[in-house]
Amino acid sequence: MPIDIVVPVYNAADDLNRCIESVLAHTSGDYRLIVIDDASPDPAVRACFAQLEARRLPQILLLANERNLGFTLNANRGVGAARPDADVVLLNSDTVVTRGWLDALARCAASDPAIGTITPFSNNAEICSLPRFCENNRWPASRDAEPMVQALERAAVPTYPDLPTGVGFCLYIRRALIGAIGLFDPVFGLGYGEENDLCMRAAAAGYRNVLCEDAFVLHLGGSSFGDKRADLAERNMRILLDRHPQYLDQVRAYITADPVRPLRELALSQYRLLSEPVPGVLHMIHGHGGGTEYHVRALIAASCTAFRHYLVIAVGDEWQLEEHASDATRTYDFSRLPGEPWSDFLAGICARFGIDLIHLHNISGCRDGLLQALSSAEIPYGYTVHDLNFACPTITFLNAQHRYCGAVTDAAICTACLAAQPAFAAVGIEAWREKHRALLAQSAFLIAPSAWAASILAKYFPQHAVTVIPHGNAGGMSRPDAVRSPLPMPDDGRAVVAVLGAIGPDKGARRLERLVELTRERGLALRWVLIGYLDRGREPFQSADGVFTMHGAYDSRALRELIEHYRVRLVAYPSAGPETFSFTLSEAWAAGRPAIVPPIGALADRVGETGAGWVLSDDEWSSEELMLDRIVAVLDWSRADEFNEAVTRARSAVQPTLEAMTAATVAIYRALPQPAGKARAAAQPISAARCLAALHYAPWRPPPAAAPAQLPQQAAAPSGNAARDPLAHVARAALRIRHTRTGRALYRLAPASLLAALKARLPR
């Protein structure tokens, strides 16, 4: 199908030169370029035409009006000069086309004979703008557009989604549509609204207005038609709304829904990959939250300029992938297809997002599949020991009686222990450890957050070197479910002991309940507050006698204030199992509170090293009665000097910093070879269609088209009657939505003169 490109011109010779040269550089095939000057007073335009004429390019037709016709008639004359069998592209003179632009538009047109108009993506095209929707995204002249073109090509299925209207900066118009409904209506004069009217008439005639999501045309926002266009906005908007009263509602609904956001998100993801030459790191965790997730998010935030970070939260076949970019976090909900090999699933994700390194933090969410995939992956991976999962499926080393086993390595003892726990009875411990031995053997690095965690790893897998990098405190993490209003705490002089975090059985939930019960039975002058929640309930709660208060979920950035509010003197850890680090201990010390901890794991090591608290004896830890005795003794005012010394040590405890943790981890990343490029090139990227489905893409469907109202060629003068004035209706609607996202977007799209006219129609 031949295609003729019509460029209406009014002044702005520099824009015109740039536009023409871009068309000549990036357009091929059966096309003709029709450039029509609307009697521009600028002599530079005539000089530009003379230069073009001197080049004698057969594909260029130059036309000039003897008098100024206005944009609408000028565009119509240009379209009228097109070949009678050619589709037409109306192209503003302040645009710059890019590689493959016209081929992409032609493919779009060929995909469906019902397509009437086509608009490409642009930096400045209202509802077809990217990266920011409905905004003029400034594009410096020095910035290369090719990465964006490649990104759109990589992200395209294509789907060619419907639009409520095309955008006139670059509008492909099918010849059959011109034959069916005609050209732009001359009633729109010098311009504004003529393309919207055309698109609404196209829809009424059964044609589609669509977005071509694999084409990109820069719109650099020159002054092709001068300032008079804004002056005509009020008049032309009235004509448009009289003819198509549904127009504004459709556009408003479209902006509110923003249905092409997934298309933009995927394209921007690929643009980032092409334009940011930094390595990509894929972090993998389970979906249980807690300290592991806190650590990973802090590491990502602290090194986001040096690496492209992606976080997978894996739950079986469902992988939620977060892409952490400087402008936003994009979330993809991927599902492994039935029968799809795990190796293909992982390799496809790595190829799509340019992954150079996989950092495993916890694999309990998809163990078997991930082990299979990693065994065949050519992308280096490493492992941070956040729990004891590699050595025991219980993760916590707790037996059937919920007691710490002592990190037994004897397979016979472990088999008997697991057999007594229904959830793990079918696990063969020797096969379990062999799988993880193979995983660790291929790891490019192993990191432990504490010397204790490193020693446990060495106990089970002594052949592997481990680097100890303590977790740095990022200053807290926000959570949307945090309780914002703390419960009152009676001020009666009773000592308050706090437990911090989400407390399940392994963290000592049942032991805490028993400690509260014993406190009541003994009538102790003691209160317990859980800043967090129990596995049996998350809602804030306070017992009638005030002995136990449960705050609920908290924002860790507010923890110090909560500790002060609840008048906490001591932080207790009634844990049943060991910890590999404990962020809450760091937070307790940062608030100047000493801690009393079990005699196992990193808690015991950290308190022992600093003296910022007390380590329970084995007997005290094994018995809630003896544990409570020790807590009461610690809080006894007769031992105030000892307690105050622990407070001083807590306040002065040297805390691992986020900066040190990040620097040490980044040094490990950078020391690794980077052979992943070849592996990605050999792998089949997960398809754009699956990525869009993972972003929950749902194309917009236009409502049934209404036939346009018939108007005379001259617009009626304002009646002054608000009930009959469509702009009065628009003004009232705009007032209702002025502070919404949709309202702000519409405000950006409207010229100043139209906004002034709308404001004038509001009641005083």
At which residue positions do the language-model features occur?
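Nucleotide-activated donor-binding/catalytic signature segment of Leloir-type glycosyltransferases, i.e.
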Residues: 53-61, 537-565
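Membrane-proximal helix-turn-helix segments that form the acceptor-binding/catalytic region
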Residues: 406-445
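A conserved acidic beta->alpha catalytic loop
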Residues: 37-48, 67, 535
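Conserved donor NDP-sugar-binding/catalytic core segment of glycosyltransferases
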Residues: 95-136
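Glycine-rich, basic loop-to-helix element that forms the pyrophosphate-binding segment
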Residues: 64-82
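Short, acidic, metal-binding catalytic loop of nucleotide-sugar glycosyltransferases
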Residues: 21-30
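A recurrent flexible, glycine/aromatic-enriched loop bordering the glycosyltransferase active site
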Residues: 73, 124, 138-176
